[in-house]
Amino acid sequence: MSMQLDVTYRKRSIVAALASVALFAVAPVSQARVTRIIVDATASIQNNTFQQLTGRAFGELDPTDPHNALITDIQIAPRNANGNVAYVASFVLRIPSDMTQASGVMWHDVPNRGGDVGFPADSFAANDMQLLSGWQGDNAGGTAVPANVTCLTPGCVTFKNHYVQTPVLTGVTGQVLGRIINRSGMGAQPLLVQGNPIPYFPKDWTDNSHDTLTIHTSETVNGNVTVGGVVANGDWKYCGGGTFAAPLPVTALPVQLCLRSGFDATKLYQLVYLAKDPYVLGVGNAAFRDVQSFFRYATADDAGTANPVAGKVTTAIERGVSQSGNILRTWIFYGLNEDEQGRIVHEGAWPIIAGRRVPNDSRWGQPDGVLELYQMGSEGPQWWHSYPDQLRNLHPGGLLDRCNVSNTCPKVIETNGGSEAYAVHLTVSWVGTDPKNDIPLPQNVRRYYLPSSTHGGGDGKMTEHPTATASCPGNNYGNGTLLANPVPSTALVNRMRLALRDWVTSGTEPPPR
C-alpha cells in the first residue's frame, strides 16, 4: 500500500511541477470564481451588535485553467453550459451590525466534518469578521448536501451543516476499503470512517462477488497484520439494517454488512469492495479558496447581489482545528492561497493540533480519516521547508513550495500537543522520514508545542489521580490504557490567536518558537 502511495505522489509531483510552469506561461481563458451568492437566513447575535448571514455560494471552475490543474478528475468532471465545472458551497458570515466599525480582519474558519466553529469573545470585541464555508464534498453524514441546494430562492434551503456539492463521476467504478472495528452481535454493522459513513455505495448491493471481506486478529501501526481468514461471500451480504437472516435493503448511507455468524469484537473486519460514482473532491478545495476571494475582493455577484462585506476585508486569516487544520496544510501545499487573479487569499494560517494532510483530492478519498492503517494523509512532504524524503526516496519538497513561487505564502503559526506527536504522525513534519535531523523552519512559520497534552487539551482540573483514560483516534477505537493528562491548551490557543492577528496586521513578531 505504501508503495502505491509513493508512486501516486511521484506522478502528482511531476504534474505539479508542470502546472507551476504553466501558471506563469499561460493566461487563463476565464477565472474560477463565485458567480452568485444567496443569503437564506439573517439573524442578530451578540446583543444585536453582530449579524449572522447563512447562505450558499455558487461557483464555477475552468478545467483548462492552470490554477486548477491539480484537481484530480477535473478534466472528466461534468460541465455546465459555460464549459465549466460547477459547485455550491455553504457559508456563514458573522459581521458587525455597523460595518463602519469593522476592523478589517476576517477569520476564515474551516468547518470540521461539517460542524460550526465558535467565534471568541475577544474577536467579537475587536469587531473582527468571521467566515465559515464548506469544503468537504463527500455528501455523507455531517457533510450531507441538501436535496434542493441549487434552488435560487432565498430562504428555500435550511442550514443544518456545512457542505459543498461537488461533481459526481456517474458510472465510474473502483475499489474502496472499509473496516468494522470493535463491533459485536448478530445485527448489521455500518461502514464508517471516523463516525461518518464511508461515502461510496457498492456498484450492486445485491451482488458481493467482486468483493472480499477479510478478518484481522491483530495488527500494528507499522502494518504487521495477522490475518484470521476470509469470510466466504455466501456468509455475508450488504444490508441497510436487520440481520443476515432478515436484511433490510440498502437505500441510504451508511452501507452496512450483515454476517451469518454475527460480529466478534475481538476481530477486525476489512472489506475491499467495488464502489460506484466517486466525487470530484478536489473541487471543494478550490471552493474554499474562491468563497474567501469573493468576500474579500468582489463588489457583487453576477446577478447583482451585493457582497455584504465589500471593501471591508483588509486582512484574512484561515484557521482550522484537527481535521480542519490538516486540510489547511493541504491547501497551502496545493498552492491554493493564490486566487485566479494571482492575489493572495489569506495573509495568515493557523493549523491547530494538526500535523498531516487530508486526502481531499483523490478519487475515492475519505477525508474523514485519521491515519488508521492504510488511510491516506501522510503521502508526500509533511514539512514546511523544502526537504528530501529519504525513506521513500522522493525529491526535496515542502508545503510552501508552490506559494513560494507565486509569492502568496501566509504567515503560519502551528500549535500542537503530545497527542498529535504520538498518535497522528506529527513528528514526521519535524524530522522527516529519516529522523536524523530537525528540519529547519522557514521564517514565516512559528511552532508551539504543549507536551503530553491530549488532542485539544484537557479540562484543566489538576487532580492528582485523574480517572479517565485518553481516547484513541480512529473509527470506534475506544480508549487507551494511559490516563488522560488534564493540562489545558486554552491559554496557549488564546495567546497565539492574538499573536497571529498582530503578526499579520502590524508585523509584530510572535513569541519565540
Protein language model annotation of sequence segments:
Residues 16-25:
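Bacterial N-terminal signal peptides
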Residues 31-513:
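C-terminal His-loop and adjacent cap/lid subdomain of alpha/beta-hydrolase
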Residues 15-16, 437:
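Short, functionally important structural connectors and interaction interfaces within domains
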Residues 1-11:
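N-terminal secretory signal peptides that target proteins for export/translocation
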